[in-house]
């Protein structure tokens, strides 16, 4: 009995060659629309879909394959006489192979000028239906949705006259993943169109970007997936110019670093980061000086860290950076001379380019945190704050220099793991106290790191002080200005302690926990 294949593809890469090989193996080809035209033009003899259905394509191609002669040929179980008799009685010929890929919905909605009508018109109906029918009946039918699988199918057909069950099952699994992702993307698009912020079902679509050697530790398996609709300003979209593949920990740290740099748009800024915590932030009138400040913030912790810059890297800055062992450098661009310096002297240094012109769009993306048995979803901590809304709660007002430093510190503290404390001046971090289980321990840690650089320094806390002992420690160190959210039932005790020591303290009213 002659084998029959149905081919209907929007991605025509390799399809002519695939069909030609099937013809050599004696297969009969059914095809539709543009695919049939492409095959006919290449001299591949095909049968029109309407010759199989006995029904013309209609409604601009919306209705062409949704017919019993197609789906009966796909779904008939070869091991059930009743199915085969029903097919014979209804003059339905069996279809043994389906090659289908879908209307380019994703590519359509990524176009900057796409209309809602264009998006709707590129929702495939017949394609997913054929794929699912064939995949369901994979015991008898081979289904191909990915041109990358053409070769393995042809090899098995040439060698054995049919594909193996293992291959058919694997291809069916790929089809169900593909159609699920396709529908999920459509659901995501429609959900956004109607402004639904809390859908009762959440479907997310990601594509494998990079298999990883291992995860957070060598005993953990890991892979890196990218959103089906890419976020332009993200580590997933960064272009790697040099160095080894990014590791699991590299990617997490790099993501944390580029989130921080978003808050420092106005001036040349360098952020150094280690284990998801900033270890140095420097801000200046030029990027070379900003690097100097970031490095001086903590020249020990920056070793083996990640650095992100928000201005082009020039040769002078590159010369300074190459003398420090770094895992990753991320910047919007590099001069040719700077890139040559970094690459020539650091073969394994991971150098990434990430344009910073899409930062605001990245801020609206939700954050997902996996827990065993569930997923937490929240919007990012990107609330717009203004010093005009802050409240000075002490008798002493901040000086102009202190006010600038407090604003700098408040931007930085948002990215320190809770309980988080940071000590800064108006252009660089001086001490970081992250992740302690009591706040006074974080205060002591940050102050100890800042040590002899406390003259004119300010301190920021990501959450309120539960007791006045924090203020006591700060005053004892000689720091004169504090910024914190406020909101403790004992706020007055902290205010009185600040007044006692002549400190100025600002309440922002906004907490910035980071776990």
Swiss-Prot record:
Q: Where is the signal peptide?
A: none
Biological process terms from the Gene Ontology for this record are: 'de novo' IMP biosynthetic process
Q: E.C. number, please?
A: 2.1.2.3, 3.5.4.10
Output the SUPFAM superfamilies linked to this UniProt entry.
Answer: Cytidine deaminase-like (SSF53927), Methylglyoxal synthase-like (SSF52335)
Q: Name one GO cellular component term.
A: cytosol
Instruction: Provide the alphabetized UniProt keywords.
Output: Hydrolase, Multifunctional enzyme, Purine biosynthesis, Transferase
GO molecular function ontology, one term from the record: IMP cyclohydrolase activity
Matching InterPro entries, A to Z? AICAR_Tfase_dup_dom_sf (IPR024051), Cytidine_deaminase-like (IPR016193), MGS-like_dom (IPR011607), MGS-like_dom_sf (IPR036914), PurH-like (IPR002695)
Q: In which pathway does it act?
A: Purine metabolism; IMP biosynthesis via de novo pathway; 5-formamido-1-(5-phospho-D-ribosyl)imidazole-4-carboxamide from 5-amino-1-(5-phospho-D-ribosyl)imidazole-4-carboxamide (10-formyl THF route): step 1/1; Purine metabolism; IMP biosynthesis via de novo pathway; IMP from 5-formamido-1-(5-phospho-D-ribosyl)imidazole-4-carboxamide: step 1/1
Which chemical reaction does it catalyze? (6R)-10-formyltetrahydrofolate + 5-amino-1-(5-phospho-beta-D-ribosyl)imidazole-4-carboxamide = 5-formamido-1-(5-phospho-D-ribosyl)imidazole-4-carboxamide + (6S)-5,6,7,8-tetrahydrofolate; IMP + H2O = 5-formamido-1-(5-phospho-D-ribosyl)imidazole-4-carboxamide
Q: List the disulfide bonds.
A: none
The MGS-like domain is annotated at 1-145
Q: Which SMART domains match?
A: AICARFT_IMPCHas (SM00798), MGS (SM00851)
One Pfam match, given by its short name, reads MGS
Q: Does the keyword Cell wall biogenesis/degradation apply?
A: no
Identify its protein family: Belongs to the PurH family.
UniProt cross-references to NCBIfam families, sorted A to Z? PRK00881.1, purH
Task: Write out the domain note.
Answer: The IMP cyclohydrolase activity resides in the N-terminal region.
Q: What is this protein called?
A: Bifunctional purine biosynthesis protein PurH
Organism (species): Streptococcus pneumoniae serotype 4 (strain ATCC BAA-334 / TIGR4)
